[in-house]
């Protein structure tokens, strides 16, 4: 089934009206010039409103040109106003196997430090090895008072590390293994010499990575297990949580995933609820990297009780036992 794209934006509608209204006012069409204008208007309507597999023709053209312009992977932009720190989460000491997403979400605003987003990312391999990280992205503008109280030089990275250590301590108190994560402990999503194609990133004839946006709706608790059940060498899944604009009680959520396979990705989504990032895999995978300071696409108001209904995979025992002391930061 060919998915229908979102409702056209104002700019797209305005351009169509600029082409259609003069032709409509010229009715009845009698001269050759009138019919030429009619043809131009029809072409504009088809070009701006036409779509294929959920993407407007103009979006397809723009992404195709972007692939040609990209000679290498997009580097994370340098910034001194945003930083991301990571906490690894290991298996719990008790019988519980449900990651406390509601508790983790409370660290969006905890101990006077406000996070722009909190992201839970899991990587599961074909052998069943599972690793999970919780990323906190902190923005300087949202924490000026807290930063100035600590130092006159605005120690953004140190402040974010404090939040990460407190989250790790809290998780350990309730029975989970946890600690701050070092940059070299995060596996690469894509090899540096991979080449972007329309359907994914190609490293070799038997190594492809495809990115997908996941619909963050009421069906998300069913979508995530369906993604994990797909055959793949690696499955990356991320859930990002943020406060809704102007609120400190309502959440927005976004989700994304990436599948590493030894075959070329198909042209359609492998699971209902996924939107392939055709022609946009480099930006999507760059944002999906657990160390990224970028937000995931597609933030929407969180359905009621979504976090309590989501079952996040439990990391395998021993996967994170290496002593880690440094927090990840992209500044």
Curated annotation (Swiss-Prot):
It comes from the Bacteria. Keywords: Cell inner membrane, Cell membrane, Membrane, Transmembrane, Transmembrane helix, Transport. The keyword Transport applies. Part of the ESX-3 / type VII secretion system (T7SS), which is composed of cytosolic and membrane components. The ESX-3 membrane complex is composed of EccB3, EccC3, EccD3 and EccE3. Part of the ESX-3 specialized secretion system, which is important for iron and zinc uptake or homeostasis. It comes from Mycobacterium tuberculosis (strain ATCC 25618 / H37Rv). Its main location: membrane. The keyword Protein biosynthesis does not apply. GO terms for cellular component: peptidoglycan-based cell wall; plasma membrane. Belongs to the EccE family. It is found in: Cell inner membrane. This is ESX-3 secretion system protein EccE3. Induction: Repressed by IdeR in the presence of iron and by Zur in the presence of zinc. It is a multi-pass membrane protein. The chain crosses the membrane at residues 11-31, 37-57.
């Amino acid at each position: 089934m060919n998915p229908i794209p979102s409702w056209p934006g104002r700019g797209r509608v305005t351009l169509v009206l600029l082409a259609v209204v003069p032709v409509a006012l010229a009715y009845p069409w009698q001269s050759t010039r009138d019919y030429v204008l009619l043809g131009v208007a029809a072409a504009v309507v088809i070009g701006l409103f036409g779509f294929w597999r959920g993407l407007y023709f103009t979006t397809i053209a723009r992404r195709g040109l972007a692939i040609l312009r990209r000679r290498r992977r997009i580097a994370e932009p340098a910034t001194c106003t945003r930083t991301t720190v990571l906490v690894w989460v290991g298996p719990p000491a008790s019988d519980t196997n449900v990651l406390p997403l509601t508790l983790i979400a409370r660290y969006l605003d905890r101990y006077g430090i406000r996070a722009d987003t909190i992201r839970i990312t899991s990587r599961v391999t074909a052998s069943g090895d599972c690793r999970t990280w919780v990323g906190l992205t902190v923005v300087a503008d949202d924490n000026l008072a807290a930063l100035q109280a600590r130092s006159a030089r605005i120690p953004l990275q140190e402040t974010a590390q404090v939040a990460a250590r407190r989250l790790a301590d809290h998780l350990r108190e309730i029975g989970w293994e946890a600690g701050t994560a070092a940059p070299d402990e995060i596996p690469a999503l894509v090899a540096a010499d991979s080449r972007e194609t329309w359907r994914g990133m190609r490293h070799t004839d038997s190594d492809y990575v495809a990115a997908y946006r996941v619909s963050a709706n009421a069906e998300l608790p069913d979508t995530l297990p369906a993604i994990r059940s797909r055959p793949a060498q690696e499955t990356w899944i991320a859930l990002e949580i943020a406060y809704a604009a102007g609120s400190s009680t309502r959440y927005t959520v976004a989700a994304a995933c990436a599948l590493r396979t030894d075959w070329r990705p198909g042209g359609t989504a492998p699971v209902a609820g996924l939107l392939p990032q055709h022609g946009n895999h480099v930006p999507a995978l760059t944002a999906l990297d657990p160390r990224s300071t970028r937000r995931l696409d597609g933030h929407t108001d969180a359905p009621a009780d979504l976090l309590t209904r989501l079952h996040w995979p439990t990391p395998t025992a021993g996967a994170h036992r290496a002593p880690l002391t440094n927090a990840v930061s992209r500044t």
